[in-house]
């Protein structure tokens, strides 16, 4: 993957956008992981790794990432109609209320933040309106900052994996070293998934997400919860 065209300026932008310090509330979501730990499906570093590898290979994160790419392309061309289309498409593709609400909340938070620190992005934000999915907001920000699209996609998947590993470290629990080891082990698959997602055509967008959806639905009525999803 060629990301050598990233200048220092662009590299710093992608680091900021993918940072866990970005105030969008990602830390409060586990995407059903809390339920999977509660019911004994995920109990260790190895079972967490198996779950994340399956998600990267077949799961809903691939749809999100593919839509992020399309949002980036539409924002680059100021194609408001296409941008709105993919925002609605992704909202319809979310299978549970928690997953939909988390995407909307993070997207809204990112667009509000960008509107304050980069006011020139407001026309795009206003065109998409509310609710705005996080993948859409991330694509708009990456396009605005002229970040290499492959680097933006790599960062999107990496930040997703980082967030869920952090949740797993708290829930299972795991040590911090185990979490970093897992993130390192996922890097080849993240890179491979990036290449695959970049090549997907619109009519090839699909995923196998029934496990995620069932866990998310069960989480809505889980008695004790640390996370919002």
From Swiss-Prot:
<comment type="function">
    <text>Required for maturation of urease via the functional incorporation of the urease nickel metallocenter.</text>
</comment>
<keyword id="KW-0963">Cytoplasm</keyword>
<protein>
    <recommendedName>
        <fullName>Urease accessory protein UreF</fullName>
    </recommendedName>
</protein>
<comment type="subunit">
    <text>UreD, UreF and UreG form a complex that acts as a GTP-hydrolysis-dependent molecular chaperone, activating the urease apoprotein by helping to assemble the nickel containing metallocenter of UreC. The UreE protein probably delivers the nickel.</text>
</comment>
<dbReference type="InterPro" id="IPR038277">
    <property type="entry name" value="UreF_sf"/>
</dbReference>
<comment type="similarity">
    <text>Belongs to the UreF family.</text>
</comment>
<dbReference type="GO" id="GO:0016151">
    <property type="term" value="F:nickel cation binding"/>
</dbReference>
<keyword id="KW-0996">Nickel insertion</keyword>
<keyword id="KW-0143">Chaperone</keyword>
<dbReference type="GO" id="GO:0005737">
    <property type="term" value="C:cytoplasm"/>
</dbReference>
<dbReference type="Pfam" id="PF01730">
    <property type="entry name" value="UreF"/>
</dbReference>
<dbReference type="InterPro" id="IPR002639">
    <property type="entry name" value="UreF"/>
</dbReference>
